[in-house]
Amino acid sequence: MKTSVMFMLVFVISLMCSSEAQEVARTYCGRHLADTLADLCFGVEKRSGAQYAPYFWTRQYLGSRGKRGVVDECCFRPCTLDVLLSYCG
């Protein structure tokens, strides 16, 4: 009995750890998207104008993502918090 309890305890702990390690992709739309971005981006230092690359360079390096916005990536399909954080700053 002691072995089965120990096995169950190890199983539950490993299950909890693995679920916390995986980031769940969710959809964020409308007010929920705006509030989530505000919460995530609060305190993220914004870049000054000198740190921005010229327009023709940014279009070249952005590729297809340059044509999509946060709504395309996180409202029309699920996204992770890491994707939302990429829009901060």
From Swiss-Prot:
Highest taxon of source: Eukaryota
Q: One Pfam family of this protein, by short name? A: Insulin
Keywords of this protein's UniProt record, alphabetized? Cleavage on pair of basic residues, Disulfide bond, Hormone, Secreted, Signal
- Keyword Secreted assigned to the entry: answer is yes
| Cystines in this chain | C29-C75, C41-C88, C74-C79
Enumerate the propeptide ranges: 48-66
Per UniProt, what is one GO molecular function of this protein?
hormone activity
Q: Where is the signal peptide?
A: 1-19
- List GO terms (cellular component aspect): extracellular space
SUPFAM superfamilies cross-referenced by the UniProt entry: Insulin-like
Q: Which GO BP annotation is one of this protein's? A: positive regulation of transcription by RNA polymerase II
Q: Where in the cell is it found?
A: Secreted
What protein family does this chain belong to? Belongs to the insulin family.
Q: Summarize the subunit comment.
A: Heterodimer of a B chain and an A chain linked by two disulfide bonds.
Any further remark recorded for this protein: Silk worm has two kinds of PTTH: 4K-PTTH and 22K-PTTH; there are many forms of 4K-PTTH.
Q: What does this protein do?
A: Brain peptide responsible for activation of prothoracic glands to produce ecdysone in insects.
The name under which this protein is listed is Bombyxin B-2
- Species source reads Bombyx mori
Supply the source organism's classification.
Eukaryota, Metazoa, Ecdysozoa, Arthropoda, Hexapoda
